[in-house]
């Protein structure tokens, strides 16, 4: 329709379909006078005369010769109207097809309730066909023939194929839409073309002739498809990195050679090929039990801050813009430079810990717990990234590096249950950093620690290296302390060092200490002529060359791996309630180290058992029974004997007085703020006890012919002379006797005879128990005699004889082994 300033023109004709369309009034004209009805008031003039009446906008039609209605357009005003109201009337650009509205003058107030009805054909007004055809991509295809001398490929080939199929020439390219007023054929009837029984009378409202795609539509579709290929890589679930070609070839070769596996359980079958984390595409080593709709995708996108997993790159991009958790939940207990360690309780942050376990299962095959995270505590290692110069963000980002978890309560002194370092952060020393941090927490708790068995392949290799380096560090520390005090001591004696001393200095259990000493090739055993008792077997630490130990430690230190600093730790042991952090009741068993901690004043007190809890519960139950008897006896006073004393109910304050409260007061005592009172005092006490012990004369170890390296080979029947020439699975080799004799002065003696306090080393034994073997042999003989008496049949006798022969052979074999006195220090990894 047209908006003009001629009041004499008739009103426009109403449109049946668009009669209810209403838009806001953005068109103002000072030439439209008020109507007698006065339905809508457009504006009120400020500081105007009373004689000037309010003007009302009217939709009128001007001269047909000047203002013709164009299809899909809003006609312009007449020249006279445009000259008088150049600022207030709509400005229309025929070429661009755009409508620009004027700026409202400050002296005009527009009513908020005013609405203007503009009636137009939406299909003609929003002519998308015209807009697309004028674009820079479609216009050359419509106006120019695409031909080339060479063979056509890709998009051009598809376009020419369409032209040949439709049999169209370049010069005859016109829009082939047929008119809506095309007459019907003779055999057509009105019922087939007028739907709903003639309810919609106009043909343009129900005609479907323009819905069929034409050759121009197909060309446009192909053009848009060609231009949107780049967006499919960005927004699609496809890989954007060039991975190693050799790995891909090996996988393809395995697929061709191997048979296609049958999928028995489709729910647990994972099709995940890569995990996107921090703009890295990481190939998982093992399958993880993600939800079924996640495992059906080839790419999984994981946020490095909240560990939320997604299957769409676009969703992942939008999540990165909106995610505000730039650090893990929980408490930050350690910070040294850019490294931080966070403590997270599995009961408080269940969703985060579950996502963490699902991510860890992609790289740890032995992990079995994914959703039951309440009994565990997680320690997250992060790298801090400062964003001070960022215009929209000032908070620092903490990138996820790795983690380790441990149980809140365990009776085996496990300080680590699961450990993971992401592949993009490996070979940087973060794995050993987490291991050392776990031992630091164990030393703060005044107990030894060890990882939970069995270990994975990478975990076992990393722990062996860690134990080796820690033992080398302790030996060098003992050497330096011995040299400082060598002036006051006799040089003809050796220092007495027990495995328990090294365990206290490192926080490791004695078994792990033996592993480390074997890796350093310094643990030897001595075999005397007498085989009467276990006292004939002594174990010593023989250092062939201190330069070799120093080179091992310096080689590792030269890599500049991060080290744990004790003074950066702000943490105290967690005080667990009766449920130990979970919803179950467990019984605490006292350990030797806990008893030692209770008797030692410098060590933190440890709650060794739950006797207070049992006494408290028993007293409450006893008082309840007493009240019930009193009620049943109709409030009669009971006669109490002199010896019959009823203990009063224990209040809650007395219950917590000797357990939790005293432990809390001890932990909150920060008088010594210079260094950690527990760790440094424990090391100082151990070193002083070593120096105060009586030395062993060198004459006792003058002969060096019977000293051998301790091996981990089990059930070996080779002669003792050949043991020195063999190597075990941990890479331990024998040393020549000349090298040992040259460096006798640097020996550290370890053995049962060298213990000043025998109770310290009773928990760790390296010898076989002969009494247990004798008892087991007697039991076997009794079982054999019982079987001979009970078997009456010939088959039974024959079986009994065969068993007797086997038992005799095994008994002879055991005697041979006992004569050779093969002592197994450490069992194999598989066992």
From Swiss-Prot:
Processing after translation: Autoacetylation at Lys-367 is required for proper function.
Biased segments, Basic residues type: 621-633
PROSITE patterns assigned to the protein according to its UniProt record, in alphabetical order: MYST_HAT (PS51726)
GO cellular component labels: chromatin; chromosome, telomeric region; NuA3 histone acetyltransferase complex; NuA3a histone acetyltransferase complex; NuA3b histone acetyltransferase complex; nucleus
Positions of acetyl-CoA binding: 419-421, 426-432, 456
A Pfam family the protein falls into: MOZ_SAS
Chain segments annotated as transmembrane: none
InterPro entries in the record: Acyl_CoA_acyltransferase (IPR016181), HAT_MYST-type (IPR002717), MYST_HAT (IPR050603), WH-like_DNA-bd_sf (IPR036388), Zf-MYST (IPR040706)
Active site, UniProt feature: 452 (proton donor/acceptor)
Bias (Acidic residues): 736-746, 755-794
Molecular function as annotated in GO: chromatin binding; histone acetyltransferase activity; transcription coregulator activity; zinc ion binding
Zinc finger (C2HC MYST-type) boundaries: 300-325
Role: Catalytic component of the NuA3 histone acetyltransferase complex, that acetylates H3K14. The NuA3 HAT complex has 2 functionally distinct forms. NuA3a binds H3K4me3, through the PHD finger of YNG1, and acetylates H3K14 at the promoter region of actively transcribed genes to promote transcription initiation. NuA3b binds H3K36me3 at the coding regions of actively transcribed genes, through the PWWP domain of PDP3, and coordinates transcription elongation. In vitro, SAS3 acetylates free histones H3 and H4. It is involved in silencing the HMR locus.
Subunit field text: Component of the NuA3 histone acetyltransferase (HAT) complex. The NuA3 HAT complex has 2 functionally distinct forms that participate in transcription. The NuA3a HAT complex is composed of at least NTO1, SAS3, TAF14, YNG1 and EAF6. The NuA3b HAT complex contains an additional subunit, PDP3. SAS3 interacts with CDC68/SPT16.
Name of the protein described by the UniProt record: Histone acetyltransferase SAS3
Biological source species: Saccharomyces cerevisiae (strain ATCC 204508 / S288c) (Baker's yeast)
């Amino acid at each position: 329709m047209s908006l003009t300033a001629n009041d004499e023109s008739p009103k426009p004709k109403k449109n049946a379909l668009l009669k209810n369309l209403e838009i806001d009034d953005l068109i103002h004209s000072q030439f439209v006078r008020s109507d007698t009805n006065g339905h809508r008031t457009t504006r009120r003039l400020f500081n105007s005369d009373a004689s000037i009446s309010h003007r009302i906008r009217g939709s009128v039609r001007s001269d047909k010769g000047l203002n013709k209605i164009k299809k899909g357009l809003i006609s312009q005003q007449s020249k006279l109207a445009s000259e008088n109201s150049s600022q207030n009337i709509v400005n229309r650009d025929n070429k661009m097809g755009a409508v620009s509205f004027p700026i409202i003058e400050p002296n005009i107030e527009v009513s908020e309730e005013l609405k203007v009805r503009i009636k137009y054909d939406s299909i003609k007004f929003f002519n998308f066909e015209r807009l697309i055809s004028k674009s820079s991509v479609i216009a050359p295809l419509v106006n120019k023939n695409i031909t080339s001398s060479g063979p056509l490929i890709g998009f051009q080939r598809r376009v020419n194929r369409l032209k040949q199929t439709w049999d169209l020439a370049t010069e005859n390219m016109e829009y082939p839409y047929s008119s809506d007023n095309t007459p019907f054929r003779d055999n057509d009837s009105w019922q087939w073309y007028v739907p709903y029984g003639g309810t919609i009378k106009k043909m343009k409202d129900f005609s479907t002739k323009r819905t069929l795609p034409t050759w121009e539509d197909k060309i446009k579709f192909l053009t848009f498809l060609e231009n949107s290929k780049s967006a499919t890589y960005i927004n699609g679930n496809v890989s954007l990195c060039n991975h190693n070609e050799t790995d891909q070839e090996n996988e393809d070769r395995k697929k061709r050679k191997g048979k296609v596996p049958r999928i028995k359980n489709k729910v647990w079958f994972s099709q995940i090929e890569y995990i996107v984390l921090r703009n890295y595409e990481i190939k998982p080593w093992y399958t993880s039990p993600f939800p079924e709709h996640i495992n059906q995708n080839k790419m999984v996108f994981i946020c490095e801050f909240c560990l939320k997993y997604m299957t769409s790159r676009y969703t992942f991009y939008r999540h990165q813009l909106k995610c505000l958790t730039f650090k893990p939940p929980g408490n930050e207990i350690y910070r040294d430079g850019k490294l931080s360690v966070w403590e997270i309780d599995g009961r408080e942050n269940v969703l985060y810990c579950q996502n963490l376990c699902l991510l860890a299962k992609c790289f740890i095959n032995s992990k079995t717990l994914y959703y039951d995270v309440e009994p565990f505590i997680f320690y997250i290692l992060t790298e801090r990234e400062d964003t001070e110069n960022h215009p929209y963000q000032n908070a620092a980002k903490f990138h996820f590096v790795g983690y380790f978890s441990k149980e809140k309560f365990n009776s085996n002194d496990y300080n680590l249950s699961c450990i993971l370092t992401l592949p993009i952060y490996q070979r940087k020393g973060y794995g050993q950093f987490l291991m050392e941090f776990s031992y630091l927490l164990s030393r703060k708790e005044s107990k030894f620690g060890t990882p939970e068995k069995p270990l994975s392949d990478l975990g076992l290799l990393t722990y062996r290296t860690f134990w080796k380096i820690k033992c080398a560090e302790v030996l060098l520390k003992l050497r330096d302390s011995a040299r400082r005090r060598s002036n006051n001591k006799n040089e003809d004696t050796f220092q007495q060092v027990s495995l328990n001393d090294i365990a206290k200095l490192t926080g490791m259990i004695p078994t792990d200490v033996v592993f480390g000493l074997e890796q350093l090739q310094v643990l030897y055993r001595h075999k005397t002529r007498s085989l009467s008792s276990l006292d004939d077997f002594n174990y010593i630490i023989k250092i062939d060359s201190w330069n070799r130990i120093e080179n091992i430690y310096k080689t590792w230190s030269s890599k500049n791996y991060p080290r744990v600093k004790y003074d950066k730790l702000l943490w105290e042991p967690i005080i667990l309630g009766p449920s130990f952090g979970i919803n179950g009741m467990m019984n605490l068993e006292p350990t030797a180290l806990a008893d030692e901690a209770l008797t030692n004043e410098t060590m933190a007190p440890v709650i060794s058992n739950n006797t207070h809890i049992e006494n408290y519960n028993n007293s409450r139950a006893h008082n309840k029974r007493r009240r019930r008897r009193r009620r049943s006896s109709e409030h009669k006073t009971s006669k109490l004997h002199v010896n019959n004393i009823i203990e009063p109910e224990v209040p809650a304050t007395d219950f917590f007085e000797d357990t939790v409260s005293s432990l809390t007061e001890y932990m909150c005592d920060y008088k010594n703020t210079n260094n950690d009172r527990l760790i440094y005092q424990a090391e100082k006490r151990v070193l002083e006890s070593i120096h105060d012990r009586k030395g062993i004369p060198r004459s006792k170890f003058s002969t060096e012919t019977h000293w051998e390296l301790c091996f981990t080979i089990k059930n070996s029947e080779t002669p003792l002379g050949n043991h020195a020439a063999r190597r075990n699975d941990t890479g331990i080799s024998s040393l020549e006797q000349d090298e040992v004799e040259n460096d006798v002065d640097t020996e550290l003696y370890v053995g049962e005879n060298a213990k000043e306090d025998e109770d310290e080393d009773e928990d760790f034994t390296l010898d076989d128990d002969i009494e247990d073997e004798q008892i087991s042999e007697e039991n076997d003989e009794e079982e054999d005699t019982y079987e001979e008496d009970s078997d009456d049949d010939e088959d039974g006798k024959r079986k009994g004889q065969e068993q007797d022969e086997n038992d005799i052979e095994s008994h002879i074999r055991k005697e041979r082994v006992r004569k050779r006195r093969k002592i197994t220090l450490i069992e194999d990894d598989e066992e």
